Structures are given as C-alpha cells and as structure tokens.
C-alpha cells in the first residue's frame, strides 16, 4: 500500500472515530448547512451529556421479573430510543434555525459582521426546550415502570435532570460545529456562543477565573461547588458571565485567548488536560 492510500485510510479512520460514520460523506467533509451533518454533532454532544449518571435510565431490573416482563411487552427500550431520537431531532432543528440567518447574511453580504444580536437568550431558550422535551420523554418511560407494583425505586429520577445537562449537549453541539468545513461562514455565531461547562472547565474557573476576577473587583466571586450536571440556570448564568468577562479581559495576552468563550474553550480545556 502506497503512502497516499495510507493517508486516505488514516483520514477515513479519524473521521469514523470522531463522528461514528464511515464512507458516508464525500471528501469526508461536514457542513453546517446540511441538516444530517448537524445531527451528527448533536449525536456526539448527547454522549457528552453523561446520561449514565441519570438514575433509572439504564433500567437495571435487579431480579424484578415482573418489571422485566412489562418493559419487554411494552417495548420499553425501543420506546426510549424513539423518544430520545425525537429530542435530538428537535434540538437539531433548533440549532439549524439559530445558524440559518447567518448563512443567508454571509451569502447575501448584508452585513452580518456588524450585527449586535445577543445569542445568549436564544441559547437559553434552546437549552430549556431540550430540557423540557427530555424530561417529558423520561416521564413517559416512567409510566411503563410504574405499572408494576412496588417499582417506584426503579423509576427514572426526572427531578434531578438539571439545566447543567441541557447546556452540555447544546454547547458541545456548537463546539463540534466549529470543526465543520464551512464553520468560517458562521464566525459571528461562534463568537457569541457560550463555553460548555464540565469538570475541567469548572476546575479552571475555580482556580484561575475566580481568582483573577476577584483581584480586579471589590466584591468577591464565589467558587462553584456544584457538579456541572447539577447546575441550575441561575448559577450557570453567573458562571458564564464571569467566563465572558475573563476571556475579554485576557484576549491577546500570554493566555492566548480571543475574548470569545466558545473559541477560548479549546485553549482552556487543552491546558487543563495537559497540566
């Protein structure tokens, strides 16, 4: 096998390992303008949501034969996959709608770069919509579980599915879209997106961002002691506000930041992994 063939196979393998698709896309390129490609980003971001931490979703029967029979008869696993697929589809549509106006603006040269649209409210709306859809889907699954007597301990813990989960899937979707071939057409969108919060980012937030901002303010910012998946919206909003201020204060200095949280997440996350 010659070197060129090796390089092609290596690139195909890299693409497969990243997106879970093999030889499905011409030239191994993904486009934000293609809905099916955006769905790939949503699927990958969903795995980052860490659904394994949602109590009851894996449905461990632990010897409960009655529950096992009911779930088999009602095709619980198939229903779960279908409901989650519906949530992903709705999120995909919402993300496409968020990006679409900028595709038109770029194409028609109508001055998208000068727009002052604030995407934060749109991202909150998308995240809350996904959270509501997802929790509703989990309640439907609980209805099957609760048909069996004494099965309440097996139910999905819907009450503890917090905003932190929703922000992760939405913000990570946007992050993955930055890897797409036409990402440069949507620069203004990415500049206004928010930083995905996970354990590494919150570690940096507590160690670096809180300390830095407290040194420049009269008031004291508190460290975040909540796990990212358990964040409520108000705490999340305060963290994002502080992250944005920190990124803007430190752009073009030795921290190598741009002033845009989502873009700077690549640098910060890499530094946290490598420290």
State each model region's role.
Residues 2-160:
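Phosphate/adenylate-binding glycine loop and adjacent helical scaffold
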Residues 1-35, 39, 139-152, 158-171, ...:
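C-terminal accessory module of base-excision DNA glycosylases/AP lyases that mediates lesion recognition
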